[in-house]
């Protein structure tokens, strides 16, 4: 039995949640999101909470049970507070700047890298060495942050590159003479 799945998801104050068959829709101050559950999962709205239950005890249904509950919790948090991911840039001459809606990165290439964020994602550059990716969809925020990091990931010798703010780089020692 899923310890995560059996807990009902409370609908926070200020959010309107509707359940229509396999689809949960949440409307809040930041926007609107929906989640469509697997056919083997049952969704009910009871006492201002969404109850997630598997329709049968198959391995597939049980594996989707906890994931569905977590996804519903994620859309509630997204439409209420939103998600953000911070990135840091280390290295001489490495910097970021906004160019309209696009992010312009100087990462040691012969050209500047220009990243156009998808719809629903906001990118901010508080300092030339900091990038903040924010939005209401947790998966999309993480995906955009990963794509930006991929342009020049941190290298293990000097730690140069783009890294997550909470990421710890395992450093290596250089060659010995």
UniProtKB/Swiss-Prot annotation:
One of its GO terms (cellular component) is cytosolic large ribosomal subunit. Keywords: Ribonucleoprotein, Ribosomal protein, RNA-binding, rRNA-binding. The keyword Transmembrane helix does not apply. This protein binds to the 23S rRNA, and is important in its secondary structure. It is located near the subunit interface in the base of the L7/L12 stalk, and near the tRNA binding site of the peptidyltransferase center. This is Large ribosomal subunit protein uL6. InterPro entries: Ribosomal_uL6-like, Ribosomal_uL6-like_a/b-dom_sf, Ribosomal_uL6_a/b-dom, Ribosomal_uL6_bac-type, Ribosomal_uL6_CS. Belongs to the universal ribosomal protein uL6 family. The keyword Signal does not apply. One of its GO terms (biological process) is cytoplasmic translation. One of its GO terms (molecular function) is rRNA binding. Pfam families: Ribosomal_L6. PROSITE patterns: RIBOSOMAL_L6_1. SUPFAM superfamilies: Ribosomal protein L6. Part of the 50S ribosomal subunit.
């Amino acid at each position: 039995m899923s310890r995560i799945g059996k807990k009902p998801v409370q609908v926070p104050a200020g959010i309107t949640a509707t359940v229509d068959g396999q689809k949960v829709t949440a409307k809040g101050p930041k926007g609107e999101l929906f989640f469509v559950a697997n056919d083997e999962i049952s969704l009910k709205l009871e006492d201002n909470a969404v109850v997630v239950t598997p329709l049968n005890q198959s391995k597939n249904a049980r594996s989707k049970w906890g994931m569905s509950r977590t996804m519903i919790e994620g859309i509630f948090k997204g439409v209420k507070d939103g998600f953000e991911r911070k990135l840091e840039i280390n290295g001489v001459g490495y910097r970021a700047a906004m160019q309209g809606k696009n992010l312009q990165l100087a990462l040691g290439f012969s050209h500047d890298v220009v990243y156009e964020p998808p719809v629903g994602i906001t990118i901010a550059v508080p300092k030339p060495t900091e990038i903040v990716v924010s939005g209401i969809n947790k998966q999309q925020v993480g995906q955009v942050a990963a794509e930006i990091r991929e342009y020049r990931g941190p290298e293990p010798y000097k730690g140069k590159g783009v890294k997550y703010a909470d990421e710890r780089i395992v450093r290596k020692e250089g060659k010995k003479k």
